[in-house]
Amino acid sequence: MNLLPCNPHGNGLLYAGFNQDHGCFACGMENGFRVYNTDPLKEKEKQEFLEGGVGHVEMLFRCNYLALVGGGKKPKYPPNKVMIWDDLKKKTVIEIEFSTEVKAVKLRRDRIVVVLDSMIKVFTFTHNPHQLHVFETCYNPKGLCVLCPNSNNSLLAFPGTHTGHVQLVDLASTEKPPVDIPAHEGVLSCIALNLQGTRIATASEKGTLIRIFDTSSGHLIQELRRGSQAANIYCINFNQDASLICVSSDHGTVHIFAAEDPKRNKQSSLASASFLPKYFSSKWSFSKFQVPSGSPCICAFGTEPNAVIAICADGSYYKFLFSPKGECVRDVCAQFLEMTDDKL
């Protein structure tokens, strides 16, 4: 969740994002960066810079390497550079410079993927990174890109050159033609892979529908309806076995859908009437909760299979528990920016 150019909450938070398995989340601040354990909530690392904002932080699971990009009012690093930070040495150990601003960075143990506004560059994760691939995209100001973290699957997904299309490339065999998915008619706003890299979920800027595709064939598996009114989708995430997804939007709600068993999702009683528009046969979330503050948030599943975590731009942390029938209760509420590492 990129909060640049300004965060209305005035708490210095510029960016928040989960690591690959959602076990941690990292925050870019106007004066450094922080790393937290997601569930249970615990501050793991706090690196403060005297002068310098960090607009993007990308973790690599729980290892000591993080990718940093400068941001905020006084960026710590130029926004056209990717800095690889070694948290054991407490310093940057790799630096990659570009001619334009960096929109996002993705890491896996052998690759650094850098997203620019109309292309994606792939490098070796070595002391002197070597450029391996360049992929063209449509204009991509949000830096949409997902990299499968599974060691047996080198799948990279990003917006194609055509509006609403998703391109899937296997970095282990780039000679194979990419899978091109015409996911939406409008501009993409969010994409997410499951941990195994077998499913991809997509949303457009309209934000009413979430679509799930098979990554090997590109076939549509499910179409899910978040709502009837347009919304800005901030985040989509699968759970560990890809049976569920959670979705957050600017309506202040987090929706939970069944990704594998469509019967669990709610459907209109008029769904079987063939003369009615497709809207009435839509599959709706079986559970949802309202973030009390209504603040922009990212969401992911917690350590318990029936838990969803919301990390909000105003510094609030919520953990909700949901039942198989969809009832939802708030379990934890905290202010993560006000924590110190010995509070929890």
Curated annotation (Swiss-Prot):
Coarse class of the protein's main subcellular location: other
KW Repeat (keyword) present: yes
Subcellular location: Preautophagosomal structure; Lysosome
GO terms, biological process: autophagosome assembly; cellular response to starvation
Keywords: Autophagy, Lipid-binding, Lysosome, Repeat, WD repeat
Repeat region (WD), residues: 183-223, 228-267
Pfam families: PROPPIN
Domain remark from Swiss-Prot or TrEMBL: The L/FRRG motif is required for recruitment to PtdIns3P.
Function field: Component of the autophagy machinery that controls the major intracellular degradation process by which cytoplasmic materials are packaged into autophagosomes and delivered to lysosomes for degradation. Binds phosphatidylinositol 3-phosphate (PtdIns3P), and other phosphoinositides including PtdIns(3,5)P2, forming on membranes of the endoplasmic reticulum upon activation of the upstream ULK1 and PI3 kinases and is recruited at phagophore assembly sites where it regulates the elongation of nascent phagophores downstream of WIPI2.
Protein name: WD repeat domain phosphoinositide-interacting protein 3
Species, as recorded: Mus musculus (Mouse)
The gene coding this protein: Wdr45b
